[in-house]
Amino acid sequence: MLERLQAIKQQNKAALAKEIEEKMGVAIDPDSVYDIQIKRLHEYKRQQMNALYAIWKYFEILDGRLPRRPIPLLFGAKAAPAYTIAKDIIHLILCLQQLFLQDERVSPYLKIVMVENYNVSWAQKLIPACDISEQISLASKEASGTGNMKLMLNGAVTLGTMDGANVEIHDLVGEQNIYTFGKSSAEVMKLYAENSYCPAKIYDGDPVVEKLVDFIVDKKMIRLGDPVQLGRLYKELVGKDYFMTLLDLREYIDTKEQMLADYENRREWSRKSLVNIARAGYFSADRTIEGYNRDIWKLERK
């Protein structure tokens, strides 16, 4: 059964690779680890943290520490028309996409693809092909979320904070079948209440974080993008970082690296995938409505 599950996932990955190459001209290896973040572009959903991981991996590859297999970081998102920082995050991701594709030392191992005009048609290809489901919002900010459920149902393994429906997924699949990181909701709320979070302290105290954030305004990036947009995002992260990207960044990198290592045990990864599919039944509309009726509506069958 696990071999059949692997084969189905591989077919879906090949179909997505074909779609991306036809529509965007970017070649993706179907044997890659498909790391996917698809959702509304918002600071609290922290696509910017995923982008900072990409910068970290970029430096790793340049230093000769190559991944076991290629890693395409796939994004699908749209921002509200007047949401300036969200558009700056998209701009950063697109600059990194171009940078990686242009560097022959990097592109065989690491790519970013932000699909154009993300919509339901793209979701129908992305969700079944996903290996790593990025659900990395700041704890306490996600009301629930349903994208994580769709990806879970299609055999993706979640990388996430203990936020929103990730908490329920964690309880359903067990710790060995989900990868969690980051501060808890209680810790985050305490930092807000005390007004004690200072991203500049993390930036100044951690050379790795400083290097990654500084790269946003590196001359390589400025050559590809708009210095105003990149500079604005840089200042936002160092000076404010309201959604605490820098706070969780190092643990996020470590957890994702553990996932990539665990992916190499293909049978065990397929088992994790199968557990996620099986446990996704909890989120069915039938069970939900039955629960509402039992606890709220109290209607009787005729």
Regions inferred by a protein language model and the residue ranges of each:
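Active-site-proximal structural scaffolding
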Residues: K9, K13, Y34, Y44-N50, ...
